């Protein structure tokens, strides 16, 4: 195992321990305490929060900006793909040539999507006013990670740069907005709990949108 591979693995362990701390903290906090009269089914509402409520047609921020929403979906697919490939690289697992190029194509599309999202945030005044340095740093690191994954799939000569980039991303992940990879699930649970307790979710026939 090369030095750079070991460094990125250490970064992963630090990241994992940090996220485990956040996870334990979430578990200890438990479910929300709601003192209003319970009117709905929590299990159905929480399930709806993760499935039905994620429909872009139910989210104003999504259906009014479908190209950006689509780019975001592609960007996340590229991120998940890159994470899987990271472990394949760590354990030196080879991929079939054809499958390797399928992954390269996926990562190319996702990287372009990430770059497009970054440029939109950079050039649109409204988005700039809502953005902070963490938004830009996170976008740059994830896009760079996808690009270096793509390049490393094409040529192993770039492996050292790939592992450096992966290590930087993993070390930054627990510090900024990227830890939403964990808090997303807690947020959807709490949202389902809140609307489920009040009997608003699952959506019935009132045309309610999130």
Regions found by a protein language model. Give the residues of each.
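Membrane-interface amphipathic/juxtamembrane segments adjacent to transmembrane helices
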Residues: 23-60
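Hydrophobic alpha-helical transmembrane segments of multi-pass integral membrane proteins
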Residues: 12-18, 66-87, 107-117, 138-150
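Alpha-helical transmembrane segments and their immediate juxtamembrane interface regions
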Residues: 88-130, 180-184
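Membrane interfacial helix-start motif at the N-side
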Residues: 51-75
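Juxtamembrane "helix exit" motif at the C-terminal ends of alpha-helical transmembrane segments
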Residues: 82-98, 150-155
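N-terminal signal-anchor transmembrane alpha helix
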Residues: 1-32
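Terminal transmembrane helical module of multi-pass membrane proteins
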Residues: 140-210
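Membrane-helix boundary/juxtamembrane motif in polytopic membrane proteins
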Residues: 123-144
């Amino acid at each position: 195992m090369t030095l750079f591979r070991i460094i990125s693995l250490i970064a992963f362990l630090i990241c994992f321990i940090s996220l485990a701390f956040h996870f334990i903290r979430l578990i200890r906090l438990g479910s929300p305490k709601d003192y209003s009269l319970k009117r709905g089914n929590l299990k159905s509402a929480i399930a709806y929060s993760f499935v039905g409520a994620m429909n872009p047609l139910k989210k104003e921020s999504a259906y009014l900006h479908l190209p950006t929403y689509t780019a975001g979906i592609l960007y996340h697919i590229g991120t998940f793909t890159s994470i899987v490939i990271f472990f394949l690289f760590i354990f030196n697992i080879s991929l079939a040539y054809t499958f390797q190029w399928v992954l390269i194509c996926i990562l190319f599309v996702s990287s372009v999507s990430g770059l497009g999202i970054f440029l939109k945030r950079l050039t649109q005044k409204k988005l700039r006013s809502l953005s902070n340095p963490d938004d830009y740093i996170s976008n740059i690191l994830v896009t760079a990670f996808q690009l270096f994954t793509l390049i490393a799939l094409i040529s192993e000569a770039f492996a050292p740069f790939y592992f450096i980039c992966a290590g930087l991303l993993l070390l930054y992940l627990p510090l900024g907005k990227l830890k939403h990879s964990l808090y997303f699930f807690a947020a959807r649970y709490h949202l389902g709990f809140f609307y489920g307790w009040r009997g608003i979710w699952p959506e019935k026939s009132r045309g309610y949108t999130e």
